[in-house]
Amino acid sequence: DYRTIPGFYFFAASYHSESRAKLFAEQIYDLMRSHGGGNMRLAVDRLSFIATDALREKRLELVDGEAVSEHARAVKSEEELELMRASMAVCEAGCKSMEEALEPGITENALWAKLHETNIRMGGEWIETRLLSSGPRTNPWFRECSMREIERGDLVSFDTDLIGPYGYCSDMSRSWLCGERPSDEQRRLYAAAYEQIETNIAALKPGLTFRDVSERCWKIPDEFLSNRYSVLIHGVGLADEYPSIKHWVDFEKKGYDGEVVPGMTLCVESFIGSEGGREGVKLEEQVIITETGVERMSTYPYQIDWL
């Protein structure tokens, strides 16, 4: 059954949007009546309110399709995991290209472009964010890359958020130094971020609840608490996905429970920066939950000699 849906978004329909949305709703109603077995309940994940109103006028019962989709996507098949590994290989090749290009005078944008170039050249698709910053722009986190020239002695922190080959997301973070020897303060920040990552990966086990995991995770020192990353751990697949596991200090107000199960692909997050401090360290590792524990998907080297 092949049908052409009338375009009801404003660019295509202008002031005919409502009438064309009604034509769309008529088609959906006909499909439901013909193939729904008497069930007029329809899961919808994304739809304009004009089209939503038109469907409800046809007496369709709309339910949240995003919840259905997110839960279905949470556990990956072996075929999906192979595609995600292929995406990660491209992502890490891009990281290598960035690290090789890192030198004083290169702009944040020019360095970030190395990741884009590698991704496109190797069959990837796009990158969701522009999260690379240097020196004083690394703290607090979430500044987009800019035309700032990176200086000798700067920390450079980034988060890939890369949609690689086959449409799968590779989401890992590293922090590097533009120069030869990190300062004692840079080493201290890095050591704390690394400890958080390793402790929290070790806390992940199949069968634990999200609450269990949050409680077992590394307790952030007060110095770094106000600038903490927004989540401890989140799902990843075609994008950042369910679940979102909150810090223990945030769990009661912002968290929700669920279960860690084999086949989930998760990202373990860390940002360490003092309030008012000059720099911050961003690390993130992408992992698979297995029957017995955790397998790392991201393998790009850490600065172990800083620890």
Regions found by a protein language model. Name each.
Residues 1-307:
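Active-site neighborhoods and metal-handling regions in enzymes and metal-associated proteins
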